[in-house]
Amino acid sequence: MSPEATVPEILTYDFMQRALLAAFFVGLAAPMVGVFLVQRRLSLIGDGMGHVALAGVAVGVFTNQAPVLTALVFAVLAAVGIELVRARGRTSGDVALAVMFYGGIALGVVVIGMSGNGTPTNLDSYLFGAIDTTTPGDVRVFAALALVVVALTWALRPRLFAVANDEEYARATGMRVTALNITLAVLTAVTVVVAMRVVGLLLISALMIVPNATAQLVAGSFRSAIRMAVIIGVACSVGGVTTSFYANTPSGGTIVLLAIALFLITASYSAVHDRITGRRHLEAEQHQHEHGPNCGHPAIEHDRHVDYVHDGHRHAPHEGHYDEHDPTKTHDDPVRH
């Protein structure tokens, strides 16, 4: 990897062509799934899935099977299992996630130990990413899986959004909440496996969460937040791979650091912008109906809180009263307090 190489010269390398394609598909899929994980406050589920996938990789190595396939099977089974446990209500989501997290680590360690010192593959490439070792077959598999994730997530986004905001309300309207939660968990598992050779199993959560955190700072609606998160994810993935080529740094860490740097810049700008322009609110008058998760009114994500749709307008709880928001405006439109 010569530092003097120009962009056209980079593209003449077959492994770089494959690396950039893999980065593009991962940057496309990860933020689309991550936006619903952020809404459901499951930002760390990608880490749990990653450790289960590591156990799958170890089993694949031990049995001389394709590690990507065994990792996919393990991650999907874990995703279905955690949602079924959570749906039964006997164990909270965070406890089930912790069990999955530590169980994946333990199984991976045991299987790796059984493989002996002469492990026939470098597990570091799955832990931290090794995009330059991606084969043409890997790219085809990643592309197919990523496109399935993107298509399903986009098609189900209204239902996934409703469940993420108010699960009980979605269930009351007749939505199959458990099936939707399992679908989201499976999509997360597939995304983890797709991304493990690009950013690594230990860093995949960052690519699912950080672009969405950045997009939500500036987006005016949920749909625009998804689009911006995908753009940021693709830009950071492709830009990180390109930067790692020139700087001779690990691709996974470079991608994540680039995403975090963009988040910090955006957060700083947003804080300064809000302080200069001010956020004004209009207090709702004669509002006697209490809003909350079980009030029966649709909940809409709005900046860092939730508005409740009521009588053609939106209300948000604020310090003992309700602010009123124009549903035709974004959260950047000033309204008076």
Stretch-by-stretch model annotation:
Residues 198, 202-249, 253:
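Transmembrane alpha-helical segments in multi-pass inner-membrane proteins
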Residues 52-62, 100-111, 133, 177-187, ...:
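Small-residue-rich segments of transmembrane alpha-helices in multi-pass membrane proteins
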Residues 260-293:
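Membrane-interfacial segments at transmembrane helix termini in multi-pass membrane proteins
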Residues 26, 135-211:
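Helix-loop-helix "hairpin" substructures at the membrane interface of multi-pass membrane proteins
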Residues 35-118, 216-227, 244-247, 271:
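Short loop segments and helix-boundary regions at transmembrane helix junctions
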Residues 281-337:
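Histidine-centered metal-binding segments
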Residues 4-9, 13-14, 18, 97-156, ...:
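Transmembrane helix-bundle core of multi-pass membrane transporters
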Residues 19-22, 67-73, 94-98, 143, ...:
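Loop-to-transmembrane alpha-helix initiation sites
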